[in-house]
């Protein structure tokens, strides 16, 4: 009757058939995708969803920090996790969980997939962040969602990172077709735009009232009295705090260092805070604050910021050493800060903690520092390029721009600004080295040291150089107050001088090491430790 047709061939059937009954279709999808997924992945996703529904912070944090990376290493090292459709069938299409899962899904693609994410994945990741932030910001009442602080920090940090990554991707026109450029500039011009990023971060700061809460804490007032309905919840409060750090990073990437420090005004960045319990957040904050200070020529503040955080890293390394992804990131940022600290110490010599000096010696930074002191501009340049943030432009290239690679333009501009400052100071170490040898020195003699064939014109130029020395060694230094922009002008040089007629009078202002204070602090710390040990009941 049917002419011997073969109906046994599976190609004639749809593996993903629907019955028309929503309940049966959902059950079919769940079974269909579950059979394609490894059992441990399926159970992890179901348990992860359940823990988030119940707000079980301990289980959420354990699965986020331990189980998810372990499964990623075992099953998805160089591939993507299951997509939204597959996961949705297992977790009953739970809207909140799927948004959070997709945040991890796209983060994994950015970090692990060779070649990086495709344009469509970058766009989808942006819209997923929009869904998440709209869910929590646009709600009339606070969303009852609890996530561990480490996830909230990494969510905000990843949001800023993906903006930075997309800005660099968009600026690289040489590897794109005309259709792709048209799509980026016309169809998706608002995707990962700087205005969207700033709007989201400021909205999180505002809805949490985090600035008012920080001001209340500094005045000894209960922050709950000014927190509002949203800010009372740890979820919103921590998102607001981390958004301040996100704004610091964004403004630093744009090269607006004044505004970068300005957004942190409620945070007393030189003091420990109850909010600074996430090591990666504290380290990132200090890196961008220190870099901003360096670019603002506030070297004393930059040196203090870098020294404090590098000491913190030395003392707390065991807290994150078991987490390889955090360890790698923190080690890289620490290495960058050692490079920046070396630059600052050459431009503005001063005493620092002996343990930091020891690291600089062990890692042979002193050789490079000696070359910088001798005026080797290439070493300055290589240190800056290695240690600086990956700057971005707030405006993408126009659709009709020449087909060039614009990625390096922002960095080259910042390098130009930095090297211009270095060139103004490159002769100062030589001047300082001569002045340190004398208490009085005639101008003509100093001029002859610098140039044996010095003329009267060279003596006049020497006066300009000495004035430059005075000017460059006088910095604005923070002393107290919540604003990192405040401070008083102080001379940071180890020597001071004045000129009377043609004679230079020099005073060595170097403060000798006070080892007694060091030992007193260690003894007090040891006694405190003894008291705590005696109070422990075994």
From Swiss-Prot:
GO terms for biological process: formation of cytoplasmic translation initiation complex. Keywords: Cytoplasm, Initiation factor, Protein biosynthesis. The keyword rRNA processing does not apply. One of its GO terms (molecular function) is translation initiation factor activity. Its main location: cytoplasm. Component of the eukaryotic translation initiation factor 3 (eIF-3) complex. The eIF-3 complex interacts with pix. HAMAP family: eIF3l (MF_03011). PANTHER family: EUKARYOTIC TRANSLATION INITIATION FACTOR 3 (PTHR13242), EUKARYOTIC TRANSLATION INITIATION FACTOR 3 SUBUNIT L (PTHR13242:SF0). Belongs to the eIF-3 subunit L family. This is Eukaryotic translation initiation factor 3 subunit L. It comes from Drosophila virilis (Fruit fly). The lineage of its organism: Eukaryota, Metazoa, Ecdysozoa, Arthropoda, Hexapoda.
């Amino acid at each position: 009757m049917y002419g011997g047709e073969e109906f046994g061939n599976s190609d004639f059937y749809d593996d993903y058939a629907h019955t028309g009954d929503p309940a049966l279709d959902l059950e079919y999808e769940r079974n269909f995708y579950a059979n394609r997924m490894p059992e441990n992945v399926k159970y992890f996703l179901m348990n992860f969803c359940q823990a988030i529904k119940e707000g079980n912070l301990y289980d959420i944090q354990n699965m986020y920090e331990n189980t998810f990376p372990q499964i990623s290493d075992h099953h998805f090292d160089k591939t993507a996790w299951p997509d939204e459709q597959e996961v949705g069938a297992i977790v009953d299409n739970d809207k909140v969980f799927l948004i959070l899962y997709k945040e991890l899904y796209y983060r994994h693609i950015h970090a692990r997939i060779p070649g990086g994410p495709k344009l469509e994945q970058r766009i989808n990741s942006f819209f997923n962040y929009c869904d998440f932030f709209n869910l929590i910001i646009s709600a009339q009442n606070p969303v009852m969602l609890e996530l561990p602080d480490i996830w909230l920090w990494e969510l905000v940090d990843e949001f800023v990172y993906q903006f930075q990554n997309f800005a660099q991707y968009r600026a690289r026109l040489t590897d794109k077709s005309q259709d792709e450029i048209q799509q980026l500039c016309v169809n998706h011009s608002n995707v990962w735009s700087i205005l969207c990023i700033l709007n989201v971060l400021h909205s999180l700061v505002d809805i949490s009232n985090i600035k008012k809460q920080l001001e209340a804490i500094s005045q000894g007032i209960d922050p709950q009295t000014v927190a509002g309905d949203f800010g009372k919840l740890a979820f919103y409060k921590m998102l607001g705090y981390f958004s301040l750090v996100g704004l610091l990073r964004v403004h630093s990437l744009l090269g607006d260092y004044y505004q970068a420090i300005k957004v942190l005004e409620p945070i007393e960045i030189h003091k420990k805070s109850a909010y600074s319990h996430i090591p990666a957040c504290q380290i990132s904050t200090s890196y961008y604050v220190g870099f901003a200070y360096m670019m603002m020529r506030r070297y004393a503040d930059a040196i203090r910021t870098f020294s404090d955080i590098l000491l913190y890293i030395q003392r707390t390394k065991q807290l994150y050493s078991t987490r390889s992804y955090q360890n790698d990131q923190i080690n890289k940022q620490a290495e960058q800060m050692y490079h920046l600290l070396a630059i600052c110490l050459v431009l503005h010599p001063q005493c620092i903690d002996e343990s930091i000096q020891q690291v600089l010696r062990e890692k042979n930074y002193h050789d490079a520092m000696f070359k910088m002191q001798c005026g080797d501009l290439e070493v300055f340049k290589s240190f800056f390029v290695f240690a600086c943030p990956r700057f971005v432009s707030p405006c993408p290239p126009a659709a009709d721009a020449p087909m060039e690679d614009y990625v390096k333009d922002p960095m080259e501009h910042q390098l130009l600004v930095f090297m211009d400052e270095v060139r103004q100071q490159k002769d100062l170490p030589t001047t300082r080295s001569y002045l340190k040898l004398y208490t009085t020195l005639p101008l003509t003699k100093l001029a002859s040291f610098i140039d044996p064939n010095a003329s009267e014109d060279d003596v006049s130029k020497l006066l300009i150089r000495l004035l430059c020395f005075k000017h460059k060694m006088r910095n604005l230094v923070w002393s107290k107050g919540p604003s990192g922009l405040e401070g008083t002008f102080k001379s940071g040089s180890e020597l001071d001088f004045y000129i009377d007629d043609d004679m230079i009078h020099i005073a060595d202002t170097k403060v000798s090491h006070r080892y007694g204070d060091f030992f007193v602090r260690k003894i007090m710390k040891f006694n405190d430790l003894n008291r705590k040990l005696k109070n422990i009941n075994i």
